[in-house]
UniProtKB/Swiss-Prot annotation:
This is Large ribosomal subunit protein uL4c. It comes from Spinacia oleracea. GO terms for molecular function: rRNA binding; structural constituent of ribosome. Keywords: Chloroplast, Plastid, Ribonucleoprotein, Ribosomal protein, RNA-binding, rRNA-binding, Transcription, Transcription regulation, Transcription termination, Transit peptide. Highly expressed in cotyledon and weakly in roots. The keyword Metal-binding does not apply. This protein (expressed without the transit peptide) is able to provoke transcription termination from the spinach chloroplast rDNA operon and the E.coli S10 operon in vitro.
Length: 293
């Protein structure tokens, strides 16, 4: 396991140097040279890299008290844009319910009787009141219920998320656990804490917390540009949509274990449970009691 601390190789999504179409270099030389034998095939593998990224730790007063490191698996720069784009499209597609439905002319009510005679009226011929040309008639090529979900491999989906997080480290920092500082819900206190940390309440900020304490959640839910996420609700869209990322020491440890180079491959059950939670809207619970074991 080799790591590099060079800052020149760090990913930067917000600088648009990695994901901007202008940064892609096109060469007239072939990317892949096929061997002379027509039976052998050569494929380009997605080489995964790792980089040790330092992040400052701030206390509740906004003072720097230490430093921690984020060590995530990331796609190489020449392939990162495609991997993140594919992960984003998959996330947005799988959120679609696909329940839109319209009635065709064969499904609308009525229309069995000819409205008026074919001839001798001076009007255009009309065969059915359910024609799409008439008000209340059917819809031509309207939407019908369908499944919009598309498949993306687990490893690639996790790589897209870790690459997006690593690309935003230039606008990220770590704060100490601050839930005990909110004895009661108060939005004014949360905004004051954000300003001490150097955050502008007008900018989109994402707080990644291990647990969502009630006082913290109620203090921040009135801030339109603020997003509070937990490991169960962490998703690629909110990471890319945020201008600032704020972590806690617990979430940094979670990310290094979950998306880092030492990630265990036998965590399928836990991964499926958390990824199912990502499809549920943030903060929405169905209230259904869990079945007794």
């Amino acid at each position: 396991m080799a790591t590099s601390t060079s800052s020149s190789l760090s990913l930067s999504f917000f600088s648009s140097s990695l994901f901007s179409s202008k940064s892609r270099n096109f060469s007239s030389k072939p990317i892949l040279k096929l061997p002379s034998s027509s039976h052998s095939q050569t494929s380009l593998s997605l080489s995964i890299k790792s980089e040790l990224i330092p992040l400052p730790i701030l206390n509740f007063s906004g003072e720097k008290v230490g430093e921690t490191f984020l060590n995530l698996k990331t796609a190489p720069p020449e392939k990162a844009r495609a991997v993140v784009h594919r992960g984003l499209i998959t996330h947005l597609q799988n959120k679609r319910r696909g329940t839109a439905s319209t009635l065709t002319r064969a499904e609308v009510r009525g229309g069995g009787r000819k409205p008026y005679p074919q001839k001798k009226t001076g009007r255009a011929r009309r065969g059915s009141q359910g024609s799409p040309l008439r008000p209340g008639g059917g819809v031509i090529f309207g939407p019908k219920p369908r499944d919009w979900t598309i498949k993306m491999n687990k490893k690639e989906r996790r790589l897209a998320l870790s690459t997006a997080i690593a690309s935003a480290v230039g606008n990220s920092f770590v704060v100490e656990e601050f839930a005990e500082n909110f004895e009661k819900p108060k939005t004014k206190d949360f905004i004051a804490a954000m300003q001490r940390w150097g955050l502008d309440p007008a900018e989109k900020s994402l707080f990644f917390l291990m647990d969502l304490v009630e006082n913290v959640e109620k203090s921040g839910r009135n801030i339109r540009t603020l997003k509070l996420l937990t490991p169960r609700s962490l998703n690629l869209f909110d990471v890319l949509n945020a201008e600032k990322l704020v972590f806690t020491e617990g979430t940094i440890q979670y990310l290094n274990q979950r998306y880092g180079v030492d990630t265990l491959e036998d965590e399928d059950e836990e991964e499926e449970e958390e990824e199912e939670g990502e499809e549920v809207d943030d903060g929405v619970e169905d209230g259904t009691p869990e079945p007794a074991e």
